Amino acid sequence: MCSQEGEGYSLLKEYANGFMVSQVLFAACELGVFELLAEALEPLDSAAVSSHLGSSPQGTELLLNTCVSLKLLQADVRGGKAVYANTELASTYLVRGSPRSQRDMLLYAGRTAYVCWRHLAEAVREGRNQYLKAFGIPSEELFSAIYRSEDERLQFMQGLQDVWRLEGATVLAAFDLSPFPLICDLGGGSGALAKACVSLYPGCRAIVFDIPGVVQIAKRHFSASEDERISFHEGDFFKDALPEADLYILARVLHDWTDAKCSHLLQRVYRACRTGGGILVIESLLDTDGRGPLTTLLYSLNMLVQTEGRERTPAEYRALLGPAGFRDVRCRRTGGTYDAVLARK
């Protein structure tokens, strides 16, 4: 009977089971499956994995076999037993320490974003984030959930560092930024984008501006603080004086906030910006009609359940930047996750 239902029914099941796939990925990362197999001298059977992880034999075997089906692990038979090893995909993106690892961002997604997504229907009804239901944190305290402990803050910062390690150079090369000798990355976190900037544009210097707790962690844990071309400045970009610069980068910042708060921040940036300078907004752009790409629409729903903001179309960014005083607004799609919007003072 199922085979007679056609592609529509199969697609529906694929959508409905999508959360299970995500949880397999999150759980395997949380348990340390990929690290264990990366460190092992040879492929391990499920009993050995279970013993090392302190997990149940039955659950471990089920998880490992599901990861094989998802092409995260590969299985061979030795001595009558199945043994498991990481695939290239897992070795590249899911093992801590890999130059291209995305493990920390996946852990954040599983521990924080996924919990909020359980309340998507309520978010749609109410039009606000779901931190109160998910974590008992008032909805206006946006980053209290993400930064609810120093470990969570460090993990989120590491996750963003990993994202920018893969995607930073592409989006920073969307426009030639060499005419801007001093660049200020507002909400710059670990300094990953600043590091990419001075690597791509060696004649530039960069300032990383973020709240004190983030700056202190960045200096302790991330290598950008060791580059003499990069400095750190503590402050709240909504309240405190902004360092003077030729170019301000707002990467994954405006999508957190309402239009009113974005306008307020952009006006502050315009006043601080040197004459002839500019602003680079890095976000995932919606299509002109607002009905795609799918990934950006999902990100926008993520903003609904977690922040005050949303993803926007190029026209909507122009409508924010123009009244703040910026001119010559140009939008460029990179073909990657994040796109670039450059405007001048």
From Swiss-Prot:
Enzyme class: transferase
CDD domains, sorted: AdoMet_MTases (cd02440)
Keywords: Lipid metabolism, Melatonin biosynthesis, Methyltransferase, S-adenosyl-L-methionine, Transferase
Molecular function as annotated in GO: acetylserotonin O-methyltransferase activity; protein dimerization activity
Catalytic reactions of this protein: N-acetylserotonin + S-adenosyl-L-methionine = melatonin + S-adenosyl-L-homocysteine + H(+)
Entry's transmembrane regions: none
Annotated metabolic or biological route of this protein: Aromatic compound metabolism; melatonin biosynthesis; melatonin from serotonin: step 1/2
One Pfam family this sequence matches: Methyltransf_2
Subunit composition and interactions: Homodimer.
Protein name stated in the entry: Acetylserotonin O-methyltransferase
The organism of origin for this protein: Bos taurus
Gene, per the UniProt record: ASMT
